[in-house]
């Protein structure tokens, strides 16, 4: 979503997972810190939400991009990967292309005139199948309620000073 929207900066809680501020460095974004007692999710920009630990029915926030995580400690634990939720159909198509080597799925790439840079971020079919197999149990299981103090204050780490 950050690449799609062309963001130049992100606002990151001091307490979150380490990869979020690393993302700013990777993408050349300006990183700003905020003190926030967030629960379940937080906004990185006006419409991009880190919802990596969120697991609640009907929790999508309209007109946003909500990133979910399936990392091994998350409720739907697949070891890696995630999902981006949006209600913007045009954005969904473009972001799918960005995740899939710039191409549309189900059409051989040689038959496409590629117009989008791709980043090879797609989920493997095996991981997706594993997720579908685990989904019924995840739906029936009460999720862990994460609290902001589950993460250290990243601004105190040497890498960010």
Predicted regions and their residues:
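Generic low-polarity alpha-helical segments
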Residues: 1-5, 10, 49, 66-67, ...
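Active-site region of PLP-dependent enzymes
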Residues: 55-57, 65-161
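PLP-dependent aminotransferase-like
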Residues: 2-60
């Amino acid at each position: 979503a950050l690449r799609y929207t062309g963001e130049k900066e992100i606002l990151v809680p001091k307490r979150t997972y380490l990869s979020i501020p690393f993302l700013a460095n990777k993408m050349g974004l300006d990183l700003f810190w905020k003190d926030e007692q967030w629960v379940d999710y937080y906004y990185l920009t006006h419409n991009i939400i880190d919802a990596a630990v969120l697991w609640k029915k009907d929790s999508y926030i309209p007109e946003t991009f909500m990133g979910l995580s399936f990392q091994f400690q998350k409720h739907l634990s697949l070891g890696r990967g995630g999902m981006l939720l949006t209600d913007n159909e045009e954005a969904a198509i473009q972001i799918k292309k960005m995740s899939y080597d710039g191409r549309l799925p189900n059409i051989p790439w040689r038959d496409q005139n590629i117009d989008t840079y791709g980043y090879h971020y797609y989920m493997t079919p095996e991981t997706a199948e594993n997720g579908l197999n685990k989904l019924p149990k995840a739906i029936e299981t009460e999720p862990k309620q994460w609290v902001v103090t589950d993460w250290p204050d990243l601004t105190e780490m040497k890498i960010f000073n």
